[in-house]
Amino acid sequence: MGLFAREPIGKDGVVIIWGGNFMNEVEAQKAKFDGKAIQQIDNNLWDVFDYITRNEDPSYNHNHSCSPNTWMKDEVTIIAKNNIDRNEELTIDYAMFVIDDNYLIPECKCGSTFCRHTITGKDWERKDLQEKYKDHFSPYLNRKIGTLNKQISS
């Protein structure tokens, strides 16, 4: 499907503000068991949403690209990484917010020169992506990256 800009968007312009129900881990895992989708946004804080609602919300058609034109500003705000033209597809690298050991896109089809070909829920751990997206992961991942890098340098 995809998500496309209806009008030009300037660099750092707000593209999407996500929303849902915020729950602790126990509640979120129960909701997942009940068929809801969950996204971790902080220690013991999860955004929980219904797949049906998600499918009605065009922002959830935000496709992955290994060379995205949007990135994270904070827990729920996605902004333009650069100027975006009208009708240009809006893309994001899922490494910026997906943290899930079981998450896998086995064959990325983004077509980027920099395509990783396989996308996982642990891509945020890659040093090359940490440098490429510095400070534009979700804040939760930015903190995890900082902690991980401190442990490595110690």
At which residue positions do the language-model features occur?
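C-terminal SET catalytic tail plus cysteine-rich post-SET Zn-binding segment of SAM-dependent SET-domain
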Residues: H64-S154
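Catalytic cores of histone-lysine modification enzymes
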Residues: M1-K73
